[in-house]
Design a protein with these regions (language model features):
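Von Willebrand factor
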Residues: 22-24, 89-143, 181-188
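Loop/turn elements at helix/coil->beta-strand transitions in domains of secreted/extracellular proteins
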Residues: 75-79, 143-144, 171-175
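DG-centered beta-turn motif at the end of beta-strands
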Residues: 15, 43-45, 81, 128, ...
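…and closely analogous acidic/polar surface helices at protein-protein or active-site interfaces
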Residues: 28-36, 47-79, 95-96
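Acidic, polar low-complexity linker/tail segments
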Residues: 1-39, 45-53
């Protein structure tokens, strides 16, 4: 479901309390030594460019900010990242190197709207299931996985509907679906723009059935996020 930042942080602190093993002071910060595996599943599709986060910022700014906050709060756990759009891939294996994880989060590039083939959350589902199965086996079935799924819920791959995630829950100890965007939606700046915001080519656009140029608007899909 869609939740604001304060609730997101409350969830993080709940996980912190439930799964804390012991803590070791580490300079100014306190590191958590834990058997938790934190897995981010991050939407990097074109719609995450929509300018309706925190007023008029890019949705993906929210994703990066919240993910980095989670890494800070759960420093000492193991982290891994899956990204998805028109394809899905695991970009880093599980690691306790928080600095590397945050650097990777900040370096994720959104898809180019000129080449993008439509976003698919089913690809994310398949990659997530594969990762959880492999890591569970590698860690002899003793691993605890916390999954954070960060997306606007929008599926743009033609003819696709969301598949069930229910058969994955056997591998997941806890987690949250974090939603980004609004029901009214937002415009997306084109990766090909060369002009100013008042130019018709600045934002992603398309031609409707009557061959009229229309500015594309991406809207949050709460139904898909709630289903996950």
């Amino acid at each position: 479901y869609v939740i604001n930042l304060s609730v997101k942080l409350a969830i993080v602190m709940l996980l912190f309390v439930i799964n804390l093993r012991f803590m070791i002071p580490n300079g100014e910060n306190t590191a958590i030594k834990s058997d938790l595996n934190i897995l981010f599943v991050i939407d990097k599709s074109v719609s995450m460019k929509a300018l309706d986060y925190n007023g008029s910022e890019e949705r993906f700014e929210g994703v990066v900010n919240d993910s980095c906050s989670i890494v800070d709060e759960l420093s000492g756990c193991k982290f891994s990242i899956i990204t998805f759009g028109d394809e899905a891939q695991r970009v880093i294996p599980f690691t306790t190197d928080s600095d590397m994880v945050q650097a990777e989060l900040k370096s994720i590039a959104l898809e180019d709207d000129y080449y993008a083939g439509g976003s698919s959350m089913n690809l994310a589902r398949d990659t997530l299931e594969k990762t959880l199965k492999e890591e569970s086996k590698r860690q002899n079935g003793n691993a605890k996985f916390v999954v954070f799924f960060l997306s606007d819920g929008e599926i743009t791959k033609e003819g696709e509907t969301l598949e069930t995630f229910s058969d994955i829950k056997q591998y997941v100890t806890n987690g949250a679906v974090l939603g980004y965007g609004t029901s009214t939606g937002g415009k997306m700046v084109s990766s090909l723009y060369t002009d100013t915001p008042d130019s018709p080519n600045y934002y992603i656009n398309y031609y409707d059935d009557n061959y009229n140029r229309v500015t594309a608007i991406s809207k949050l899909d709460e139904k898909n996020l709630k289903q996950i």
